[in-house]
């Protein structure tokens, strides 16, 4: 996969950071020593962790060299490691694993989530936020355009669902707090929606296409967005963006 673009990702930095702020506010820990930020990206979520626990040893993990470089530049007091979340092993048990908008990219959550819980200290916390927009028009239309243009399905899998995650984490020995929030982001245009998803959800669909194929894909995608995202009275567009939040505290 081609590398992530930190500048494009940070174009909507405030909107992307807000769920991390709200997830962190629900973490029931006072003092922590060892923290991992899984899928840390350019370090915007890591900065929140460092602000709350400045004395903690915080390690950001990301598979993107560009994102890791950006994070290291922004936060020299934190450690950053280029690695696959599924294979990374901490040097010691963790007090907090924080994963903001990262685990949705990985398969087999029935194995992944218990594995992450096993990396925690007793009373340690796994805090997760994942976009839950597989059935939103933004993502449905990606699949429809791909089908029209004879491209294979390259999108991520849908999330397992609230009840499944509750059972997975309860059986792994956790107390579970789980909720879902839909944000309505004010967007100035359909092109702004495309700019948003190009940095994330559209990446798998576009990465192997030629420049001309990408343009055809995006032109058709823009046309279909016009049907699903009408203008408000003031000319803005409301982009519904559901997100699933989980705070699981290890009790065993």
Swiss-Prot record:
**Function, as annotated:** Catalyzes the S-adenosylmethionine monomethyl esterification of trans-aconitate.
For molecular function, the Gene Ontology terms on record are: trans-aconitate 2-methyltransferase activity
Originating gene: tam
Family statement: Belongs to the methyltransferase superfamily. Tam family.
Q: Which NCBIfam families does this one have?
A: PRK01683.1
The top EC class, named as a word, is: transferase
User: This chain belongs to which protein, by name?
Assistant: Trans-aconitate 2-methyltransferase
Q: Which InterPro entries match?
A: Methyltransf_25, SAM-dependent_MTases_sf, Trans-aconitate_MeTrfase, Trans_acon_MeTrfase_C
Key words, A-Z: Cytoplasm, Methyltransferase, S-adenosyl-L-methionine, Transferase
One Pfam family in the UniProt entry: Methyltransf_25
User: Where does it reside?
Assistant: Cytoplasm
Q: Which reaction does it catalyse?
A: trans-aconitate + S-adenosyl-L-methionine = (E)-3-(methoxycarbonyl)pent-2-enedioate + S-adenosyl-L-homocysteine
Q: Which domain of life is it from?
A: Bacteria
Query: EC number(s)?
Result: 2.1.1.144
Provide GO CC annotations from the record. Answer: cytoplasm
- Is Cytoplasm among the key words of this record? yes
* Example GO biological process: methylation
Primary location: cytoplasm
């Amino acid at each position: 996969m081609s590398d992530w673009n930190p500048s494009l990702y940070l174009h909507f930095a405030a909107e992307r950071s807000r769920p991390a702020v709200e997830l962190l506010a629900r973490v029931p820990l006072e003092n922590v020593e060892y923290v991992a930020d899984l899928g840390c990206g350019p370090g915007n979520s890591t900065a929140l962790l460092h602000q709350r626990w400045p004395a903690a040893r915080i390690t950001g993990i990301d598979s993107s060299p560009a994102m890791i470089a950006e994070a290291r530049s922004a936060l020299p007091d934190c450690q950053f490691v280029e690695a696959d979340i599924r294979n990374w092993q901490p040097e010691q048990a963790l007090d907090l694993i924080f994963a903001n908008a990262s685990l949705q990219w990985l398969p087999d959550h029935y194995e992944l989530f218990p594995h992450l819980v096993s990396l925690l200290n007793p009373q340690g916390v796994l805090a997760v936020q994942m976009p839950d927009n597989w059935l939103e028009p933004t993502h449905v239309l990606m699949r429809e355009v791909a089908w029209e243009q004879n491209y294979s399905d390259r999108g991520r899998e849908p999330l397992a669902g609230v009840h499944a995650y509750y059972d997975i984490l309860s059986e792994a020995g956790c107390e579970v707090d789980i909720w879902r929030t839909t944000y309505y982001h004010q967007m100035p245009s359909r092109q702004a929606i495309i700019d948003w998803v190009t940095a994330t959800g559209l990446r798998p669909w576009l990465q192997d296409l030629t420049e001309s194929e990408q343009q055809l894909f995006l032109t058709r995608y823009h046309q279909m967005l016009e049907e699903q995202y009408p203008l408000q009275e003031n000319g803005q567009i409301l982009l519904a963006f559901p997100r699933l939040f989980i705070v699981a505290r290890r009790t065993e």
